[in-house]
């Protein structure tokens, strides 16, 4: 009952998702121009036609538009949620903040420019704004790790024993391990839904392993 209103509103948002026929049309598109044209007919249009993207390549415009759209969806779901349920929902959404951190650390490892990657960061509001700004601005992996000091992510990497010695994989694995262990613990707090949550997590973990 407590989540009834929120659940109804979130279900209504499903109408904005692309239908099977739209996804199939995109999959069969002959080029990026056709993909862009098809997406302009969907709920992604407002993000695609943003003036700030005009000088980007079509591929970058699509990726950035999808990032903005998804960030907005996360914020809306959180806003619709009952206050006493938001901490749990934020914990689930933490997956996307960890993906942000992994993306940024990997970009430092590959020596990609800040300009190339910063528009692909999802806005979750979990990592303090200052820490995220420092992570984005970091010149290399070590500076990026320093930006995370004082956060659970730095502690997770430290506890795992992972170190950066030219190989980024141990750091990324430590962050994934932190999230999945946390989710398994959280699932135990909801006995009636534990099996469903653990099944979902198992599917995600299996997909990650594949």
Tell where the protein language model's regions lie, with residue ranges.
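N-terminal domain-start signal
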Residues: 1-210
């Amino acid at each position: 009952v407590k989540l009834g209103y929120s659940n109804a509103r979130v279900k209504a948002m499903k109408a904005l998702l692309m239908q099977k026929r739209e996804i199939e049309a995109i999959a069969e598109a002959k080029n990026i121009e056709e993909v862009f044209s098809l997406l302009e007919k969907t709920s992604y249009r407002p993000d695609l036609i943003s003036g700030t993207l005009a000088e980007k390549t079509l591929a970058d415009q699509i990726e950035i538009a999808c990032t903005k759209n998804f960030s907005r969806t996360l914020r809306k779901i959180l806003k619709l949620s009952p206050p006493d349920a938001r901490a749990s929902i934020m914990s689930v959404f933490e997956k996307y903040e960890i993906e942000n951190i992994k993306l940024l650390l990997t970009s430092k490892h590959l020596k990609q420019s800040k300009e190339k990657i910063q528009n692909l960061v999802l806005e979750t509001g979990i990592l303090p704004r200052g820490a995220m700004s420092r992570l984005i601005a970091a010149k290399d992996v070590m500076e990026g790790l320093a930006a995370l000091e004082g956060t659970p992510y730095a502690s997770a990497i430290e506890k795992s024993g992972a170190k950066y010695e030219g190989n980024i994989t141990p750091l990324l694995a430590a962050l994934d391990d932190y999230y999945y262990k946390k989710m398994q613990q959280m699932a135990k707090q909801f006995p009636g839904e534990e099996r469903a949550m653990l099944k979902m997590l198992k599917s995600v973990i299996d997909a990650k392993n594949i």
